[in-house]
Amino acid sequence: MNLFFKELKLVNTIEGAIKELEKQIDISPKLNEIIDFIIEAHEGQFRKSGEPYSVHPILVATITSTFSKDEDVIATALLHDVVEDTPFTLEFVEEKWGKNVSNMVKGLTKVADIREENFITSKDSSDTKIVQAALTFRKMLIASIDDPRVLIVKLCDRLHNMLTLAVLPQHKQRRIAEETLVVYVPIANRLGISTLKNELEDLAFFYIYPDEYKKIDDFLKENEQAMQLSFNTFIAITKNLLEKNGFEENEIKIYSRIKHHYSIYLKMQRKGITIEEVLDLFAIRILVPSDIDCYKALGHIHLEFKPLVSRFKDYIATPKENGYKTIHTTVFYNSKIYEIQIRSFDMNSVAEYGIAAHWAYKNGEKIALQVQILIG
């Protein structure tokens, strides 16, 4: 789990939640006013885990702020449960904080209404019925929401709920985890937000297949140090290679990444292999200034190391539907196989944050963002 999310998982006081938000943004007078308001509006309400309810919207706003610093989007995250869980109305929200915020809060309230009407909550429901209901919910959700900012706040809301899922009964944990995989993960994927997608997948995986999760987690913990040492050596060699061939030290970044648990599990299931046979448990990621630099770096790497041609993929020339662009290559060095991902810094922002990396606004209005085109 991402260290940032691990820290948020431990926060259980209003003061602690506000401190986390302050680490991400300078809290404006408008947002301070909204924080004071939601603390009062949700007074006397507590989550199943015992903390004051307003801790939740503040932490949802904290997660949201990593994708957008837009004041109205963060305000929406803070207010996302007000209409549903307190006596205050959308008209009140619009009068106090404007139509842009009230429209987004309305979208989030609509999501809650759709879920309430369509999703099965009985603990006796079969897995098949739960999945079918979740698929229906996803279709209706996508059809009814035309602002991607609403979906991103909802994804952040779901992530915080997943972080605190342990306090619920086991049958509810599994139902919510399955709903997360069927409804929210595909939306995060189509919006290109790998940061949210990967966290949601692993949290859901933990509750749906705990034994399989533990096996993968134990293997990674047992082997991570040795594998990391091997990759550190390879990173140093690759960095030296690129710097010798014209790349400046301060214009490139090279680091390793570990494949997340659910992705490992899917590859094992799809290919019928053991975890030891998954070639890309670890990979190195090379960030360079421009598209052409990606190909320059690739050329130098293929001249230095023998490539495994069958595993080469050029997602720059042919991007994924969600906008993902990266060159994937696999090479041999010292009788070991190393996966390498090469992308520009801009491509990395899109890969991590998806549509949120290139939101464009003019006078508070969205420019050319259509959820139906992206997801439908």
Question: Where would I find each of the regions flagged by the language model?
Answer:
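Active-site helical microenvironments for divalent-metal-assisted chemistry
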Residues: M1-Y338, R343-G376
